[in-house]
Amino acid sequence: MSTQEIFDEWHRREYPSQYIWENYTYPNFGISDDQLVCRLPIRIFNCDNCQLIIDNEEISEIHKSTIEYIVRNQESFIEDIRKGIFDYYTFLWNDYLNEFEDDNKYPNPMNKDAQIIDLMIKPKAIHMAGKIDEGYFGICFNSTFEGDHGLGIEMRNYKVKNVGAESVGFNLHSVE
């Protein structure tokens, strides 16, 4: 078993609430409940694919160009994502995670670099509002340190704007 498979298996056992909707899967490419859902083969943090969710009945040209940019240039913003998550994790660790005394699950981020985040998260969805500006999307992750709520990132112009619970990655607003 690979390290990623071991993490996935452990994460399912530890945080089953994050998988409630897993069996309520949409077709690989289709429309359901006013959302267009398909699989986007994007590799971020050692995950081969994420679910792409667009809150619209069709994919606009801006959606297409944003998706193409993500696929082609993901390496250019992975460090920004990693640093944003690392800063958020450091905040949580200083706030309350250090009280758990479990160095495997909640390693001390002090004197470590942001690469430790790679072992603690796995992307699960890329989310886009119906009408967007180019480069505006959210990424949602399973994570060991935000087990009950998941982890979310709001991206603007392909830069991290906000990191928090999973709702941050899903509560995107359409531009008018």
Region locations from a protein language model:
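Acidic, proline/glycine-rich low-complexity IDRs
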Residues: 1-31, 108-176
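Long, contiguous N-terminal structural blocks used for assembly/anchoring
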Residues: 1-106
